[in-house]
């Protein structure tokens, strides 16, 4: 029987929407939190709002625009080109401190609404080199949050060891593959659904979908 409550860190993208469906299957009550950190595309927040409303999930939007002032990057500035990391450098889309701050504020919100679980869609398999998507970081932060608030939060990372094809498969298991494909925004250029097809996020998303659909046809 479902008994516990969870808060889902929710961007309106493929991964966090899949996590939303994952959480709906596991917890008696869930709420979602989206962070406005000055993203290039306001549409990202609107997507999150629409999905949460359609699924009947209480949705919080927190102002984190200070992050844009501290750490300019390709996700928040039109004049910074979206580029993969070269020669060991981080991609231009990396936002220093983003997951640290988002999960910390999600922890504060969780303590206020009585949620034990904090769900996030970070993934080490297809993590694009972001250090704050690693399992070791999440485990460390989980300990820190509990010590800082004298609580017993559990940070759940259902996608941590899944590649993009497996993430599509997980959405399909919940009967949500088409929902995730048509309603979510992953594209760095702000194009909903299958996206622009050119940016790194769209290429990774399409590659995973093609792999999964090819695999599914065989069975």
UniProtKB/Swiss-Prot annotation:
Q: Which residues make up the binding site for Zn(2+)? A: 187, 196, 199, 202
The EC number of this protein is 6.3.4.20
Top-rank EC class of the record's enzyme? ligase
Named in its record, the pathway it takes part in is: Purine metabolism; 7-cyano-7-deazaguanine biosynthesis
* InterPro entries per UniProt: QueC, Rossmann-like_a/b/a_fold
Kindly list the biological process annotations in GO that this record carries: queuosine biosynthetic process
**Reaction catalysed by this enzyme:** 7-carboxy-7-deazaguanine + NH4(+) + ATP = 7-cyano-7-deazaguanine + ADP + phosphate + H2O + H(+)
Cofactor remark from the record: Binds 1 zinc ion per subunit.
Q: Which residues form the signal peptide?
A: none
Question: MF terms per GO, please?
Answer: ATP binding; ligase activity, forming carbon-nitrogen bonds; zinc ion binding
Q: Kindly list the cofactors needed.
A: Zn(2+)
Instruction: List UniProt keywords, sorted A-Z.
Output: ATP-binding, Ligase, Metal-binding, Nucleotide-binding, Queuosine biosynthesis, Zinc
Disulfide-linked positions? none
Chain sites annotated for binding ATP: 10-20
Q: Which NCBIfam families match?
A: 7-cyano-7-deazaguanine synthase QueC (TIGR00364)
Against HAMAP family, the record matches this protein to: QueC
Subunit structure comment from the entry = Homodimer.
- What is the purpose of this protein? Catalyzes the ATP-dependent conversion of 7-carboxy-7-deazaguanine (CDG) to 7-cyano-7-deazaguanine (preQ(0)).
Q: Which family does it belong to?
A: Belongs to the QueC family.
- Please report the name of this protein according to its UniProt entry: 7-cyano-7-deazaguanine synthase
Q: What is the lineage of its organism?
A: Bacteria, Bacillati, Bacillota, Bacilli, Bacillales
Gene this chain is encoded by: queC
